[in-house]
Amino acid sequence: MAGSEQQRPRRRDDGDSDAAAAAAAPLQDAELALAGINMLLNNGFRESDQLFKQYRNHSPLMSFGASFVSFLNAMMTFEEEKMQLACDDLKTTEKLCESEEAGVIETIKNKIKKNVDVRKSAPSMVDRLQRQIIIADCQVYLAVLSFVKQELSAYIKGGWILRKAWKIYNKCYLDINALQELYQKKLTEESLTSDAANDNHIVAEGVSEESLNRLKGAVSFGYGLFHLCISMVPPNLLKIINLLGFPGDRLQGLSSLMYASESKDMKAPLATLALLWYHTVVRPFFALDGSDNKAGLDEAKEILLKKEAAYPNSSLFMFFKGRIQRLECQINSALTSFHTALELAVDQREIQHVCLYEIGWCSMIELNFKDAFDSFERLKNESRWSQCYYAYLTAVCQGATGDVDGAQIVFKEVQKLFKRKNNQIEQFSVKKAERFRKQTPTKALCVLASIEVLYLWKALPNCSFPNLQRMSQACHEVDDSSVVGLKYLLLGAIHKCLGNSEDAVQYFQRAVKDELCRQNNLYVQPYACYELGCLLLDKPETVGRGRALLLQAKEDFSGYDFENRLHVRIHAALASLRELVPQ
């Protein structure tokens, strides 16, 4: 049986739903699975779930589709029961795929060397590769569910699961490449006899070019994500990564995801979303392109332009349109897009929350603290992800509007909502809220705190010049010795965005020298070192000093807020420097 080649019978009870329409024709599994994922991305979450559940026992591919929807539901809600259900579903799919494997996985080359009847073995070859890719996909999602628990044993377990998945991806990727090469060789070697071709090459009635291309797309999604994610791991974790035998080639990762996104596999739309996520969220947040805050926008816009016709009602694609507009500093347009995405996601609470989060951030970028407060307060009350963090943002924005008494009440809630003890964001939120829990905050300090989170989340480059100047004025108005170092760090970052490099250098130097921040804001000095180092890299005569400051930020400080986040940025800055000036 070749799971990817089976056909579905016509349904008798068509109904009016999209799921019924998709299932009415005798589609192949691969086409049906792709239709289900497309349905999901066009806000047909229920219809997609219904389609996959109806056919989940017909083939491994449809079983995986049902398990993926279950996994997505768990990751969007973080509800314990849904996470357990997703684990059970993924394990069921994994067992289904293993049921006919018999524990023996021969390489394609061995099959050909043994001179087996390719016409007979080709369908099982396709089926086996499909099953192996699905097993690896299931293992990756099981590892993610394990990591969410944030326990040491879960991290170790997740790491070994990922190692198994990577080995399968790598082997399948090489096998499929070998099959494609053999197929091309067969097409070009016209001098071979018909019998010889049948003995040694992939024939048309065996493995079709279309099947090979779809399989390559299927494996390229996981293969590419591995490369891309591992390429961003900070140096302090590389030893563990190398021990597990993972790769990390950024360009290979992007190339594989592009291939997957253009394929006819069910994960093609997911590869598209992964690319949009990388270009509009990861690249700017981790400063993977140094001070070039608009790197990746052209690629993201091209992807959206190519795909928007296929997803006219997709809240997720509208969300990424808003992300692009925000990065281009078109905040009003971004707000319109996020509000549209919010309306499109009427039945998808978790996607609504992602949109609300962006609306809150865009409002903060505009210094519209009232609207920001409304968004974050709703998230605090509705979201299950991190009420502690949302409570902190709510309190900061409430205080920045001038309602300092109301803000103090919410600051007191932050500690009570602190649940994820190993989460850096929640640790930061609790630490920052502690001061205002004991004494009434001032409006000036709350405005400073809002600028601080804009800086830490790399949102200052999205601000307009007039708003940056207002922020600079707000920083100067703060007269509190306990936040002097923080004030200088923020002023340096603001002037850097305004293009005033000389002023920025002076402020960063003052922040580096401020010893009081070691008591109150431990992260200020290493972050100031990093910022100063990046500025000095821009001039040939100060490159050496800039590199020394980056190494100082990396090696001389530890135990501060968002340490791993800074290490990723330092790693990216040093890597780009090596590209320009080979060591």
Swiss-Prot record:
Q: Which Gene3D superfamilies does the UniProt entry name for this protein?
A: Tetratricopeptide repeat domain
Keyword Repeat listed? The answer is yes
Instruction: Look up the record and give one Gene Ontology term from the biological process aspect.
Output: cilium assembly
The record's TPR repeats, renumbered to this chain, cover 315-348, 353-386, 485-518
Q: What InterPro entries does UniProt report for this protein, alphabetically?
A: Iml2/TPR_39 (IPR019412), TPR-like_helical_dom_sf (IPR011990)
Keyword Nuclease on entry: no
UniProt keywords, alphabetically: Repeat, TPR repeat
Where are the annotated segments for Disordered? 1-22
Query: Which N-terminal stretch is annotated as signal sequence?
Result: none
Protein name, UniProt field: Tetratricopeptide repeat protein 39C
